[in-house]
Amino acid sequence: MTGELEVKNMDMKPGSTLKITGSIADGTDGFVINLGQGTDKLNLHFNPRFSESTIVCNSLDGSNWGQEQREDHLCFSPGSEVKFTVTFESDKFKVKLPDGHELTFPNRLGHSHLSYLSVRGGFNMSSFKLKE
């Protein structure tokens, strides 16, 4: 079963790492993990797209999306169980993928505190842990 999950009032600060575990639905086109201060202030929009064999990262400020950063290292696959981490540094995010590959994305909005997490699409999150 897939759907949506939102966590509000989270306390993610620079130096924190979010560990995410879950399963990717069979037949899905992709999923989205958002981190920021709300639905219209996303510091990291992380979007593996299976139909395009790419991972798209972006930021959202109000109604304005930034320039997409595309990563062709797609090590996720539908029907699999995965673990990956997102580390928040003051100026960037480091996403460590299940195979150990790491991608970075700048903290374009410059926030020093993230309170919002959402998961959408074909990903069933079984656990998440925020470590400082």
Curated annotation (Swiss-Prot):
Q: Which GO terms describe its molecular function?
A: carbohydrate binding; galactoside binding
Q: What is an example of a Pfam family matching this protein?
A: Gal-bind_lectin
**Every Galectin domain range:** 4-131
Disulfide-bonded cysteine pairs: these are none
Gene Ontology BP annotations? cell-cell adhesion; positive regulation of apoptotic process; positive regulation of inflammatory response; T cell homeostasis
Swiss-Prot/TrEMBL keywords = Lectin
Q: How does it assemble?
A: Homodimer.
Instruction: State what this protein does.
Output: This protein binds beta-galactoside. Its physiological function is not yet known.
Q: What is this protein called?
A: Galectin-2
